[in-house]
């Protein structure tokens, strides 16, 4: 089969399945590809293909993760499914596969379980914008009143963790019946729940603002002085766009207020550009800035769009020994390096009240105080390193200064 061209005609959305082990996340993922393949909008992927997920590395951490893609009439989706519970935690904290929305799979006979709660909490912490629920295995429930109770419990749980529990769509069905049905007719009754779910995902999960439409930000990777022209900073534009004549700020790595300057040139591969946009690797020539005024680890950004901070709260996953992490626990006051965007900054860790220590393999909320302010915002991912090796991964959940 010839490779199909990637059509940019539809908005592109990243989703993923979350929920307790054995509640049917992978079965549902396979069922979605099967049902949508009946109208040529996906390639069917069997359960085993999805379950046997390849490993990826993100921020120094190995994660098993399976990507599938499919389309609805309205959108193009990239969907992630992880085989193990630890893989989910690692994926959500490192943002290896970004989620614009999540499909929470709950087995109706079991109701919400510990990992259901943990995944909802994590989704809130890492700011997954929206959740749609698939209430699975309803064919195993005879009592409609029990189903109502499970739904009620789920809505309360979602509200407790800061999601709009009363509004969230809950679709009932059986992923296995859809997956195992021999029917080639997309209107077969077993497929109705999958189409209903995709409709809910289409309608309820908002289209994210594209990176290029957000305020300009570029982490500085390198600084050069060019004789007779001034100082050039290079990096990959994280969001927004930049063109000659734009006023920008240099933020972080100093206790002084951010410096303002004007971009007098934008280059890519030694060629001048009209404008650099999100995803481009560029060099920006800055007016009136000395080579010694800028350093790696700072960011170049739209004025006022991001502030430097020292103190924040973060959700952190600490690597196990087998993953190349620490062999021993650490305590409050532990001072590793925090790799934020392009550089390491030393900081001290504070543990929550009543928590003595953190063991390798733990997933915890902690406060972090850096020795210098850095451009930070909620949702920013970082790695924790010790002697150059990654010992943890985190995401900023709250700014504290």
From Swiss-Prot:
Residues 10-209 form the tr-type G domain. This is Elongation factor Tu. Mg(2+) binds at residue 26. One of its GO terms (biological process) is translational elongation. One of its GO terms (molecular function) is translation elongation factor activity. The gene is tuf1. HAMAP family: EF_Tu_B. It is an enzyme of class 3 (hydrolase). Belongs to the TRAFAC class translation factor GTPase superfamily. Classic translation factor GTPase family. EF-Tu/EF-1A subfamily. It comes from Chloroflexus aurantiacus (strain ATCC 29366 / DSM 635 / J-10-fl). Residues 174-176 are annotated as: G5. It catalyses: GTP + H2O = GDP + phosphate + H(+). InterPro entries: EF-Tu_GTP-bd, EF-Tu_GTPase, EFTu-like_2, EFTU_2, G_TR_CS, P-loop_NTPase, Small_GTP-bd, T_Tr_GTP-bd_dom. Monomer. Its main location: cytoplasm. Keywords: Cytoplasm, Elongation factor, GTP-binding, Hydrolase, Magnesium, Metal-binding, Nucleotide-binding, Protein biosynthesis. The keyword Ribonucleoprotein does not apply.
């Amino acid at each position: 089969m010839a490779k199909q061209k990637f059509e940019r005609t539809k908005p592109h959305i990243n989703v993923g399945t979350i929920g307790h082990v054995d509640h049917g996340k992978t079965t549902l993922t396979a069922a979605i590809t099967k049902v949508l393949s009946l109208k040529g909008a996906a390639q069917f992927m069997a359960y085993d293909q999805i379950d046997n997920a390849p490993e990826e590395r993100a921020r120094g951490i190995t994660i098993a993760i399976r990507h599938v893609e499919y389309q609805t009439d309205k959108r193009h989706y990239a969907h992630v499914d992880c085989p193990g519970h630890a893989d989910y935690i690692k994926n959500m904290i490192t943002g290896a596969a970004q989620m614009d929305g999540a499909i929470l799979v709950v087995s109706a006979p079991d109701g919400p379980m510990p990992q259901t709660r943990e995944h909802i909490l994590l989704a809130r912490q890492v700011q997954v914008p929206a959740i749609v629920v698939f209430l699975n295995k309803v064919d195993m429930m005879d009592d409609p009143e029990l189903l109502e109770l499970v739904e009620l419990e789920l809505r309360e749980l979602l509200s407790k963790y800061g999601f709009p529990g009363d509004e969230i769509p809950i679709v009932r069905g059986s992923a296995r019946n859809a997956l195992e049905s021999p029917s080639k007719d997309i209107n077969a009754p077993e497929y109705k729940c999958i189409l209903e779910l995709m409709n809910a995902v289409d309608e309820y999960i908002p289209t994210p603002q594209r990176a290029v439409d957000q305020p300009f930000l570029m982490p500085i990777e390198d600084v050069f002085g060019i004789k007779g022209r001034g100082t050039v900073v290079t990096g990959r534009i994280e969001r927004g766009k930049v063109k000659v004549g734009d006023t920008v700020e240099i933020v972080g790595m100093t206790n002084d207020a951010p410096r303002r300057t004007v971009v007098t040139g934008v280059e890519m591969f030694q060629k001048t550009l009209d404008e650099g946009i999100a995803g481009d690797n560029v060099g920006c020539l800055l007016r009136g800035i000395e080579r010694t005024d800028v350093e790696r680890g700072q960011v170049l950004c739209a004025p006022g769009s991001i502030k430097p901070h020292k103190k924040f709260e973060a959700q952190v996953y600490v690597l196990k020994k087998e993953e190349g992490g620490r062999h021993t626990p650490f305590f409050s006051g532990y001072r590793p390096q925090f790799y934020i965007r392009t550089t390491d900054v030393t900081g001290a860790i504070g543990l929550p009240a009543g928590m003595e220590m953190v063991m390798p393999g733990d997933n915890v909320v902690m406060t972090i105080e850096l020795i210098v302010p850095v451009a930070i915002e909620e949702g920013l991912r970082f790695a924790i390193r010790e002697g150059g090796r990654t010992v943890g991964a985190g995401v900023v959940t709250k700014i504290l200064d």
